């Protein structure tokens, strides 16, 4: 990750609306964004689009998730894969993640197989303000509200809206990466 970002400053856990101010451009035309004494002509916003516009058309609905982790010291292989999805109606969780398979189950120092395992079950949760929004709720009512926000977004020439929350659209990860690369190519004229 460090090589990917290079010299790009990254700040985590920062509330965009509190940390970034939109101010008039020195040229007198349009606006720029200011953060920590630095100005930016354009920003990429991947947060909730309704929150960006201060919920002026009302809040959009989102789904959230909750996670329960369990350490299984006597089980070396719980499911044989990093992620197994569960789509059955009678199963309360949507997936189980077995973390050791992301690192191939080897101790980083010794290279020996790791004894035991840790799993995390992912459960759907109703989203409320203050919770992490994971997915948009794309129904007729929310999509109509989103279209109003989208019209405002098109007027903000110095903001690129992206991701599930910024575009209020469900994306699988491969699709969001493709959409991000396409948006970057369009923005950079390549």
Task: State the predicted function of each range.
Residues 11-15, 99, 162:
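Conserved beta-strand termini and adjacent loop/short-helix elements that scaffold enzyme active sites
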Residues 8, 40-41, 156:
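Short, well-ordered alpha-helix to beta-strand connector turns
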Residues 177-190:
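Internal hydrophobic alpha-helix adjacent to the cofactor/substrate pocket in enzyme cavities
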Residues 153-169, 176-180:
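Short FAD-binding loop at a beta-strand-to-alpha-helix junction that anchors the flavin cofactor
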Residues 57, 171-174:
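Short, solvent-exposed loop/turn segments at secondary-structure boundaries
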Residues 2:
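Active-site phosphate/pyrophosphate- and oxyanion-stabilizing loops and adjacent acidic/basic residues
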Residues 21-152:
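Mid-domain catalytic core of redox enzymes
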Residues 5-20:
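A conserved beta-strand/loop element that lines the FAD pocket in flavoprotein oxidoreductases
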């Amino acid at each position: 990750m460090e090589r990917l970002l290079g010299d790009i400053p990254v700040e985590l856990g920062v509330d965009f609306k509190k940390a970034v101010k939109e101010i008039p451009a020195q040229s007198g035309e349009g606006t720029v964004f200011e953060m920590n004494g630095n100005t930016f002509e354009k920003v990429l916003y991947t947060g909730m689009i309704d929150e960006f516009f201060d919920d002026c058309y009302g809040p959009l609905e989102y789904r959230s998730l909750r996670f329960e982790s369990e350490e299984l010291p006597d089980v070396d292989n719980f499911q044989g894969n990093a992620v197994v999805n569960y789509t059955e109606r009678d199963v309360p969780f949507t997936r189980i993640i077995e973390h050791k398979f992301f690192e191939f189950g080897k101790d980083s120092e010794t290279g020996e197989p790791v004894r035991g395992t840790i799993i995390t079950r992912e459960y759907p949760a109703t989203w409320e303000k203050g919770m992490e929004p994971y997915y948009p709720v794309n129904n007729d009512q929310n999509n109509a509200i989103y279209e109003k926000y989208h019209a405002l977004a098109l007027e903000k020439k110095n903001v690129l809206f992206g991701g599930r929350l910024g575009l209020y659209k469900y994306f699988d990860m491969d699709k969001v990466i493709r959409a991000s690369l396409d948006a970057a190519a369009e923005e950079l004229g390549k």
